[in-house]
Amino acid sequence: MADVERLVDLLAKVREKSRHLVLKVEGRYVAVGDLHGDLDTLERVLEEWEPPYLFLGDYVDRGDHGLEVVEQVFQLLVEGKAVALRGNHESPAMNLDGGFLDELCEKIGRKCGAVYKEFEKTFAALPLVAVVNGKIVALHGGIPLKDDMTPAALEEVEKISGDMAIPRDPLAFQILWNDPCPCEKYAPSPRGPGIWLFGAEVTKAFHERHGTRTIVRGHTYVPSGCALHHSGGVVTVFSSSAGPYKRTKPKIALVKDGVEVYDLATKNSAKCPQDIDIF
């Protein structure tokens, strides 16, 4: 059984360190895409790549070791060795059906409901965006669109307020859920209402507005473990090979002034497919 007192204390420490929706960080980071309870991949990353790490969200659900994964990620965050962004699966709406709540009850027992409430508060406090060296934007899903269908500025994201447990603010919601598409402007997403596919013109306008070069993101399952979109203006990294993702070739990325993708199995530089249709 998990040490409940220690776990609750860890979650409180994460909340203490998570005070901004948009982080600005300096240095070189190892970016890790969706893990979805893939403890083997996480441990391999920690063994073979030096910190600091930049986790792009989706630590839980679908795989068998969501609790162990999110504990390790949060411990690294508290120790100052990692940035941990929020994914769309860091949400009660997803954890109910995705498996994390059931996993928690199996591993913690009768206190799982109270402990999950602590997770819910902690997930709600996680940052949505990290800007690395002023040039690389890291987030889970994609560029959020305003009512006039132009890309929102990060300054607007910083001002988001209200209950974030299930983000009702459309900009926060879209950061967690949007995806790039091989199109010019935008299109409704098959994922559901309020979610958008954003095209090359949106990416270009976003980078011009912020003086940035590349967005590194997770969220989208690609069997190759990575994909380039919009002439390299967006890079997708997927790291899980657990649960339904056993055929994935997991990737990570080194992020500094650019984004270099590497194969987790070989540690060689990876060639990623370009402008694929992800749906």
State each model region's role.
Residues M1-F279:
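Feature recognizes metal-dependent phosphohydrolase scaffolds
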